[in-house]
C-alpha cells in the first residue's frame, strides 16, 4: 500500500466568502502558481485551481460532533493503525472536551487519517500543500506578503514561541487578504500530501541545513512547515497539530 508520505501570481484580487457546507464559513482563494519551497527555481511551478478554504481551523466542538456521529473515531475506539496513543489527548474523555479543550479552540491531537475522514464526511477534503501555502502567503494587506519583512518576522516569531498549555479560540487574529484566519500563529495544520515537497524520488530531503535547501531563502517559514510535515506519519498526533478543510471552487469535493 502506498505510504501516506508519498500519497501526497494569484489571478483575481476579489475576495468571496460563502458557506459551501451548511454552517461552515469558507473563503474563496483564486488559483495561482506555487513552487514548493525545496524545489529549484529552474523547475516548473505547479498551477493551483481556485478553491474554497475554511476561514478557521476545525474546532473541538466540531470534531466532537463528528466522533459522536462516527464512534469508530472516538479516542477509546480508534484503531492504532489510524492514530497513535496521543490521539485527542487534551480531551477529558471520548465524548467530553474538558478544560484543556475549549469548544471553540482548534482541535489538536488529530491524525492525518482522522482529519481526512472529518473533511470527507463534510463533503470536503484536506488542502494540498500547494493550496495551503498559496493561501498562507497572503498577509492582512497583500495577497502575497512574503516580501514584507515586518509580516515575515511576525510569522517567524510565532515559530520561536513555546506552545501554550491552553489554546485560544479560533478566529481571534486579523484575517488575511482572502478573509482566512489562523494560518499563522495558532497551530500547525495537516495537508493532504504532507511531506511530498521534501521528497526527491525515494529519498527524503532532510532539513538539518535549515533554509539552505530552500528555493527562496526569504520564505523560511514555508521551509519550516515543509520540514515539520516531512517528519510526520499518517497516524501521528501532537498537541499543536490541527487542520482545516477545503472544497473545489467549481463544486463540492468528491
Describe the function of each predicted region:
Residues 28-29, 93-230, 234-239:
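Functional-site microenvironments in short loops/helix caps that host divalent-cation chemistry
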